[in-house]
Amino acid sequence: MKETIQGTGSWGPEPPGPGIPPAYSSPRRERLRWPPPPKPRLKSGGGFGPDPGSGTTVPARRLPVPRPSFDASASEEEEEEEEEEDEDEEEEVAAWRLPPRWSQLGTSQRPRPSRPTHRKTCSQRRRRAMRAFRMLLYSKSTSLTFHWKLWGRHRGRRRGLAHPKNHLSPQQGGATPQVPSPCCRFDSPRGPPPPRLGLLGALMAEDGVRGSPPVPSGPPMEEDGLRWTPKSPLDPDSGLLSCTLPNGFGGQSGPEGERSLAPPDASILISNVCSIGDHVAQELFQGSDLGMAEEAERPGEKAGQHSPLREEHVTCVQSILDEFLQTYGSLIPLSTDEVVEKLEDIFQQEFSTPSRKGLVLQLIQSYQRMPGNAMVRGFRVAYKRHVLTMDDLGTLYGQNWLNDQVMNMYGDLVMDTVPEKVHFFNSFFYDKLRTKGYDGVKRWTKNVDIFNKELLLIPIHLEVHWSLISVDVRRRTITYFDSQRTLNRRCPKHIAKYLQAEAVKKDRLDFHQGWKGYFKMNVARQNNDSDCGAFVLQYCKHLALSQPFSFTQQDMPKLRRQIYKELCHCKLTV
């Protein structure tokens, strides 16, 4: 039988006072084979617990009263584990700086200890972070922010922010302060990036549905000392959808802060759509009959005014926009009439009514505002030696100024449409001719005889304005086209001198004399300072195809979209 030794430290346990129940150490299981008794070792900082056979009672254990530490039936491994626990406990006592006879002090007499050491708090942070990370990797959550809640707390503590959940302190009795955590708000920017929503999801985001907190499900939860009991989805008072959406997310609240019921045909999923409110679903889908109570709540709406679009129409619109985005790299050349025409061809129905056309326009605008749908980065159009990027094609949007890349590639498309008739000069030709004379551009036409063509097109770019020189070779006329109707007499003179020098070099003396210059005044005039490049491209196209100038300033938005498509297809629409 092993002899037990009990220390006589001043901080050891004393017999419990009146009203405190005795606490006994849990007995350990007996081993069949007794190991040889090791030499007893005294622990630093105190003695051993009482002998189980002595009949003494052990007071109730409170932090940091040491536990009974020796048992004859314990093995060496258990003793080592016990020593490690006691060492951790001693570190905890040292960290808290507890005075002697701490357990016998009253609650009101206990002084407030200092904050624990940094090592223990770091270990707690690491454990919390690893737990959240494992939950993020290996579990499927039914909430949008459940995993990131723990992770957000960990990040906030690492950054030194105030955390409402304090450590267990003897002064507070281990109670958790009931203060909402600032690091776990649903609108916190430290949360996960929102999923890429589909077309209906973008509509929900516009109506404020996406910003509402997710609906938790499951048993009652307690967080920060507050008890919260969720309502059942089947409860009519809860206002939640009675079915789980395909992506596993719960329904969300409407813009008024109340849970809204969606009609049966509105709970569809296109691209991670979380939920659909009743007001949006009524605008998008037909056949959703509102009850008398809902109609009474909405006296401003006309009776029987339902949505003219169904879910298959919305799905078709999204597929059309996806295909358009992949073909043209952006939705710049897209018009609502084009989408309406495709819908009419597919469904054999009329979509040109104001109500349906307005909803199609709303779908297009919502699709454009979705992340990643503005343009396709890396989209390029290559034709011969020309390469157009999205930055070049973006000059055709709105009232942007066209650059030289767009001008030169479109001119080559015009020239290749009627190659035997037209020759198009580069946009840098006139600038080089004006600064360096004929010697600077004499090699530009070494492989072509311009006097065998019928029409020469020379774009002129002076400062920030585009204009055009058109040369009728047979009639020996030089015509200046300017959408702002400015009279630039130097341009025709420079071109006339170039033609005379080229005639001498190519030995075409019949074209050396007889050139006349004109200014074309009865042409379409621009009303702004940004559409001069688009006017020049239309001048080139109509002159090459021998078409009259039937366009005006009001046609420029449509013509810009047409030029964009022609550049992407590398072919003019004749």
Swiss-Prot record:
Enzyme's top EC category: hydrolase
Location, primary (coarse class): nucleus
A GO BP annotation: protein desumoylation
GO MF annotation list: cysteine-type deubiquitinase activity; cysteine-type peptidase activity; deSUMOylase activity
Regulation: On oxidative stress, SENP3 degradation is blocked by inhibition of its ubiquitination, which stabilizes it as it accumulates in the nucleoplasm.
Family the entry assigns: Belongs to the peptidase C48 family.
Role played: Protease that releases SUMO2 and SUMO3 monomers from sumoylated substrates, but has only weak activity against SUMO1 conjugates. Deconjugates SUMO2 from MEF2D, which increases its transcriptional activation capability. Deconjugates SUMO2 and SUMO3 from CDCA8. Redox sensor that, when redistributed into nucleoplasm, can act as an effector to enhance HIF1A transcriptional activity by desumoylating EP300. Required for rRNA processing through deconjugation of SUMO2 and SUMO3 from nucleophosmin, NPM1. Plays a role in the regulation of sumoylation status of ZNF148.
Protein name: Sentrin-specific protease 3
Organism whose genome encodes this protein: Homo sapiens
Name of the gene encoding the protein in the UniProt record: SENP3
